[in-house]
Curated annotation (Swiss-Prot):
Residues 223-237 have a biased composition (Basic residues). GO terms for molecular function: rRNA (guanine-N7-)-methyltransferase activity. This is Ribosomal RNA small subunit methyltransferase G. The lineage of its organism: Bacteria, Bacillati, Actinomycetota, Actinomycetes, Streptosporangiales. NCBIfam families: rsmG_gidB (TIGR00138). Residues 210-237 are annotated as: Disordered. It comes from Thermobifida fusca (strain YX).
């Protein structure tokens, strides 16, 4: 299927000198990713516009040299894309499923991404171990649940960047109660990549304004995972 993975002129301009690495990643998604059920075959013709470029424009919101955790990384969207486009970032791909972490490790090795590590686990299992300036998430969970998983991973002043669709504003309203239960934060909906991608990428940004006090447990999600399995959420990853 790799013959269908041809970057547009807009993609060439956006990725610039990192395009060859991005092209190789797109080919891995179209070939190995499809074969292992990590991405649907119907997505291959639109890998660049709907997936890689949609993720890439989020880099506008990430400060230079930031530590990034890509929560529920799946096949590496957006974490691998951001690591390719921004070598200054230190990216942790956090993913609980073995078959996905195997693929992610293969990508990191084949693409020679020295700024990436793959960590197998669930967000709630690593709240005491990992911290970042930015947590990204795409097609992982409804916003109220995602907030409970992501915010404890953030340093003071850090932001959750949740890539969402047309219901972004509605999801944010539905998450107001959960936001109030967490440490102080500021939440908004922004659109990035105007003029580069059409439509622009919609992001719910939640920035925490205080540090998580030492010895203080983060407020748990109102909808915790059930023991013994991971409930399927959103699109197939």
């Amino acid at each position: 299927m790799t013959e269908h993975v041809v970057p547009s002129d807009a993609a060439r301009e956006l990725f610039g000198e990192t395009l060859p690495v991005a092209q190789r990643y797109a080919e891995l998604l179209a070939d190995v990713g499809v074969a292992r059920g990590l991405i649907g075959p119907r997505e291959v013709p639109r890998l660049w516009e709907r997936h890689l470029m949609n993720c890439a424009v989020v880099e506008e919101l990430i400060p230079k040299g930031a530590d990034v955790i890509d929560l529920g990384s799946g096949a590496g969207l957006p974490g691998v894309v951001l690591a390719i486009l921004r070598p200054d970032l230190s990216v942790t791909l956090l993913e609980p499923l073995l078959r996905r972490t195997v693929f992610l490790n293969e990508c990191v090795e084949l693409l020679r991404l020295d700024n990436v590590r793959v960590y197998r686990g669930r967000a709630e299992e690593v709240h005491a171990k990992l911290r970042a300036d930015i947590v990204t998430a795409r097609a992982v969970a409804p916003l109220p649940k995602l907030i409970g998983w992501a915010l404890p991973l953030l340093r003071k002043g850090g932001s959750l960047l949740a890539l969402k669709g047309e219901r972004a504003e509605a999801e944010l309203e539905e998450a107001r109660h959960e936001l109030a239960r967490q440490r102080p934060n500021i939440a908004d909906v922004i659109r990035v990549g105007g003029g580069k991608v059409d439509p622009a990428t919609t992001v719910v940004r939640v920035t925490v304004t205080t540090a998580l006090e030492t010895g203080t447990k983060a407020a748990p999600s109102r909808s915790p995972r059930k023991p013994g399995g991971r409930k399927k959420r959103g699109r197939k990853r």
